[in-house]
């Protein structure tokens, strides 16, 4: 009996991008389409009270990521690039980079944060996102707006450099720069490869 054809994206996929680029939405959709586990790095990182393991207990955060990606197939959504590279990039097949324009990211962040705050959505079972503090640019790292505006070009340059690094030559990088490209990417994606029997 012939072996099933591998999926064109592989079995281990990472979705990255700036804040509000749609990483979790696309990652969850990919995982469902491919019938593999979905790993959201924010869910592994944030404890009640907006305590981030990446800052308070990096070893514990890294261990959580290792455990979540121990299997042979998964879709990971989120950045945390240092931790991602240390834990699973050596086994990564495909990285989908959501490189949307900064004005669009700001608008998406405003709409998302407002919706979450109005509905008091509980994120990752632990926290409710505030709205007004996200807009307080002068508060630096406490403001999501600050992160988007000040880190956009830096993150873009960093990702472009990673794409050229020999150590990551085994990874297929897919760069999506508009919402239409993301939609077309999803629509063109085949379903899960049939399992061997």
Q: Where do the model's predicted regions map?
A:
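NTP-dependent small-molecule kinase module
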Residues: 2-10, 142, 146-197
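Hydrophobic anchor at the beta1->P-loop junction of P-loop NTPases
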Residues: 15
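The conserved Walker
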Residues: 19
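Conserved lysine of the Walker
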Residues: 23
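Hydrophobic positions on the alpha1 helix immediately C-terminal to the Walker A/P-loop
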Residues: 26
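Active-site signature of alpha/beta-hydrolase-fold catalytic machinery across serine-
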Residues: 29
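Conserved nucleotide-sensing/catalytic segment adjacent to the nucleotide-binding pocket
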Residues: 37-95
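A glycine- and Lys/Arg-enriched "phosphate-lid" helix/loop adjacent to the NTP-binding pocket
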Residues: 100-155
């Amino acid at each position: 009996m012939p072996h099933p054809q591998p999926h064109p994206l592989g079995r281990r996929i990472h979705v990255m991008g700036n804040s509000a680029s749609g990483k979790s939405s696309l990652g969850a959709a990919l995982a469902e389409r491919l019938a593999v586990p979905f790993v959201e790095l924010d869910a592994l990182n944030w404890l009640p009270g907006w305590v981030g393991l990446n800052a308070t207990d990096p070893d514990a955060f890294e261990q959580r990521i290792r455990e979540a990606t121990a299997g042979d197939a998964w879709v990971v959504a989120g950045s945390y690039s240092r931790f991602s590279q240390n834990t699973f990039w050596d086994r990564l097949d495909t990285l989908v980079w959501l490189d949307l324009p900064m004005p669009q990211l700001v608008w998406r962040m405003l709409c998302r944060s407002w919706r979450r705050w109005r509905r008091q959505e509980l994120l990752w079972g632990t926290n409710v996102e505030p709205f007004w503090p996200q807009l307080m640019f002068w508060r630096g790292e406490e403001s999501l707006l600050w992160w988007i505006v000040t880190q956009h070009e830096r993150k873009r340059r960093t990702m472009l450099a990673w794409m050229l690094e020999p150590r990551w030559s085994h990874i297929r990088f897919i760069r999506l720069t508009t919402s239409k490209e993301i939609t077309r990417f999803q629509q063109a994606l085949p379903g899960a490869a049939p399992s061997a029997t």
